[in-house]
Design a protein with these regions (language model features):
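Active-site acidic catalytic loop and adjacent metal/ATP-binding pocket
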Residues: 1-10, 43, 145-201, 205
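All-alpha amphipathic helical-bundle segments outside canonical DNA-binding/catalytic cores
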Residues: 100, 229-241
Length: 260
C-alpha cells in the first residue's frame, strides 16, 4: 500500500505543457478542496512532496477512485452535483490563481486558430471559410469582457474564480450512495483555470433546448443551496462552447502523431 491506499494512479505530465509552478498550484487547489470536504481526488504527499521527477518526466501519485459516469437525467443527481460545484467555487473564490491561466479568447481561440493555420491543418478547400467563421466568432465573443480580459461591453462585472475547468461528465465519477463516501467525486483537475462559474456547469448539459433548460435548472437549484449563481452568466454558455470547439480542434491536431 502507498500511504495507506491499496491502489494508486500515477500521472505523468506531458513535457512542456505545464510548468512546475502551475502543477503545484493545481495540487494546492485540490488540497484546499479536500480540506473543505469537497470530494475531489488530489495527489498524495510522498516524502512531503506531491510532484516528483523520473527520467525527465514530472509525475504525481493519487489514490485510485472508481465509479461510473453520473446519471444526468436524474434530477437528484444533478442537484447533488450542483451543490458540490457551489462548494468548489466557494473555495475557488477565496483567492486567485497566480500561475495558471484563464478561460479566455487568447488561449482558447486566437492561439489555437493561429496554430492550426500555421501548421496547415485545415484543408485548403475550406480554409478560407473556416478562418472567416473563426474570426467572426472571436469578434463576437470579444464583446464579453469576462472572456476578453479587456474592453468588452457586456458582463463586465462577471467575477472570475478558480474553477475545475474541464467539468464534463467523464471527470465526475459516481459511486453508489449506500456505500461510505458515495455520490460524486471530481477528478482530473489538471485543466483548472480561472473563469466564470458557468464554465463548470454548461458541459453537463445535453439534449434539446428543453432538456438542457431543465438540467440547468436542477443544477442551479442544487448550486444555490450553498452559493448564489449569477444568471447573467448564462449568456456566456454559447461563447464558451465556441471557444472549446476551437481549442479542442487544435488539441486534437497537436496530438495527431502522439504515440500516447
Amino acid at each position: 500500500p502507498v500511504d495507506g491506499h491499496s491502489a494508486v494512479v500515477v500521472k505523468f505530465y506531458r513535457p512542456g505543457r505545464w510548468s512546475d509552478a502551475q502543477i503545484l498550484e493545481e495540487h494546492a487547489f485540490a488540497a484546499e478542496l479536500m480540506a473543505a470536504e469537497v470530494p475531489a481526488v488530489g495527489p498524495l504527499a510522498l516524502h512531503g512532496q506531491t510532484l516528483h521527477q523520473h527520467g525527465g518526466f514530472a509525475f504525481s501519485v493519487s489514490p485510485r477512485r472508481g465509479g461510473r459516469r453520473p446519471e444526468l437525467d436524474d434530477a437528484e443527481v444533478l442537484e447533488w452535483i450542483g451543490r458540490f460545484l457551489a462548494r468548489i467555487h466557494t473555495v475557488g473564490a477565496r483567492q486567485p490563481f497566480e500561475h495558471r491561466g484563464a478561460v479566455d479568447i487568447a488561449t482558447f481561440a486566437q492561439e489555437p486558430m493561429d496554430w492550426l493555420l500555421a501548421h496547415q491543418m485545415i484543408p485548403l478547400d475550406v480554409q478560407g471559410a473556416w478562418q472567416k467563421a473563426c474570426v467572426s466568432a472571436i469578434d463576437l465573443i470579444a464583446g464579453y469582457a469576462a472572456l476578453a480580459r479587456a474592453g468588452g461591453q457586456n458582463l463586465s462585472e462577471t467575477r472570475l474564480i478558480r474553477l475545475h475547468g474541464d467539468c464534463y461528465p467523464g471527470n465526475i465519477l459516481w459511486t453508489p450512495t449506500d456505500l461510505p463516501g458515495g455520490g460524486p467525486h471530481f477528478v482530473d483537475l489538471d485543466d483548472a483555470r480561472s473563469g466564470p462559474a458557468v464554465q463548470d456547469l454548461w458541459m453537463l448539459l445535453s439534449g434539446d433546448r428543453a432538456q438542457q433548460q431543465n438540467q440547468l435548472g436542477q443544477l442551479v437549484d442544487g448550486y444555490e443551496q450553498f452559493r448564489e449563481f449569477d444568471r447573467d452568466e448564462l449568456a456566456l454558455i454559447e461563447p464558451l462552447r465556441t471557444l472549446r470547439l476551437i481549442h479542442y480542434s487544435a488539441w486534437l491536431a497537436r496530438r495527431w502523431d502522439d504515440p500516447a
